[in-house]
Amino acid sequence: MGGPVTTSARTHVVPTESLPREAAVWMARALQDTLATQRRVSLALSGGGTPGPAYRALAAQVLPWERVDVYFVDERFVPPDHADSNYRMVEDTLLRPLRLSPSQVFRMEGEREDRAAAARDYAAKLPPVLDVVLLGMGEDGHTASLFPGHPALEETEQRVLAVVGPKPPPWRMTLTLPVLRSARRVLTLVSGAGKQDTVRRAQAGDLSLPAARVTNSEWMLDPSAAGR
């Protein structure tokens, strides 16, 4: 199959089987572009089923990985070796294959009992501006752990919050919209026909959908999500 078809300056429609590779190429180029002008680059990653294969493909990209610092967009309040841990998924697909130094990985500490303190401590670890961010989107339009109708969507001061989500395990830690909207490069990666209507609404600017509020994001979709 061919490469991505760019339908607008901000939306890329990619064959389903090529989605992981094309997302990895997008991230690698964004990292390289940033490293051309600064010594280190920050990369913030999401959990979910769609990003995992993209991280495996990213691990195969030739980059000066010793100059990349890895952060997390959100995390469940579970231990790092738990099956539901975003850290565990990223560790399995990207961190372990690359053998990144622990000093380059800034994990959200989901095992902590004081959730508010864990969120505050993570906010203190974040750089002033994230360079490259990969997001996903659920069928309900949530992104990171920012859910429709949740008060966290209106947060303007705190950079990281502990929130309760609609699915178990309910407690999550998440970056807030000001952090996501200030990032230099953002990609929202979506696949599947079940998300087609939500993608359409988000791209039309339906601000009841958290993903629509990340107005600086590019989108990478497979044909099903794009309605093709």
Where does each model-flagged region fall?
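SAM-dependent methyltransferases
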Residues: 2-10, 14, 21-23, 28, ...
